[in-house]
Amino acid sequence: MKVKKWTLVGIVGVFLSGCTCKPVEHTCRIGAEEGDATQRIQQAIDAAFTAGGGTVRLGAGTHAVKSLRVRSRVTLYLEKGAMILGSRNPEDYFILDSDRIEPVSPSLITHEAWTIEQSCTLDNFTKYPASRWNNGLIRLLGATDAAIIGEPGSVIDGHDPYDPVGEEFYRGPQGISAINCTNLTLCGYTIRNTGNWAHRIADSRNVRAEKVTGLAGHDGFHINGCDQVRILGCTFKTGDDCIAGFDNTDVVVRDCFLNTACSGFRFAGTDVLIEKCTLRGPGEYGFRGALSKEDKIAGAPSGRAKRNNMLSFFTYYADGTHPIRRPAAKIRIVDCTSHGTDRYFHYNYGNEKWQRGQPLADISFIRVTATGLKLPLSAWGDPALPLSLTFKDCRLGFERPQKELIRGAHLGTVWIDNLEVRGVDGPLIRLWNEKAGTPQVSASGLKGVSAEVVPSSDVWSVRGI
């Protein structure tokens, strides 16, 4: 029987990073050198995988790569001062096409370009693990017990690649693209300037991200079809949504700081707890879609983008790009604070393309405080599944006067236990489509707004996010 050992270098590195220790069998350290480091690093990863598992350590300095595949039981470990620098050429990222260690079936490969018509449907390139859209600076496919760990001061830099046939005709590869993985650990590093999402994780189980920082680029952490996910003590300052995804079960987001030019959360799932998080707007980094074509091609910094307002604290998300296994329900937002978001809650089911999948059953806000809001809460539910909305021990304050706190339709129950509102001169709810039914309101300890439900004769008009 082979006995697992602790290597001294492995113990020291894990201690410095603050991440959970793992026994390692094989350790290889790679120093920074001039030129393309892809082959040297990938060969070390493959050797560790072939040996049954191990750690590949990158020393301080710049490691320029095209794309890397991290495999089962392998830890990619970045020492302090180490930087993985991605290629700006999107054609450099098709590594799964020629993988001889773990070959990928041709049926899972496509180089199809992005199209507007397919952007929200299942019948598109997102379902192919080895698609152009799923390409990433670091790839994981079907990996078990894999990890990417960085000491403080380590960086994964996507280099703002431009792809003229990528999403929205400019977005490049993802930062870390992980599909069908189990027991995935992400810890300690800073990831920035990715061509698309910093983390694209799909159909995976037991995912843990801790003390990760995401800067600029697009979505910070985007998960679909994942179970048992923990996002702890992370910082995301992004030009797109900080934490996004749907069809996720048993998700905990705790002690995170979020800053964005889009939504702090564009999310859905079952048994979701968002706890002790802080959101601040406007975004430090602008939305890259607002850059000129010339700036996108040149890889200009995200700070040049003209729009940086934070659109919402929580926007519901469910489109047709991924099968939805369970009802979206039991979402709890607890002990969170925010300042400077346009909206606090945005649910506009069926009226915009990112909210035409499965409807939301219920969401609860408990001991939350929001200041500097600019627009009422949006809550347009599904006639077949009216929304249940709960506020307990909450405070909501608006930057300028509003005519109502909530505008919406197809609401089932609104349950309030201590809610203080500032900046609203009007009812609790302004209701559209009154003939479809009036919500049942139970309000105790409501301050700053009347517990009224007032019908509206106006045309429903809420700008999509």
Predicted features and spans:
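Bacterial N-terminal signal peptides that target proteins for export
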Residues: M1-L8
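Bacterial N-terminal signal peptides
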Residues: V9-S17
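Extracellular/periplasmic carbohydrate-active domains that bind, remodel
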Residues: C19-I465
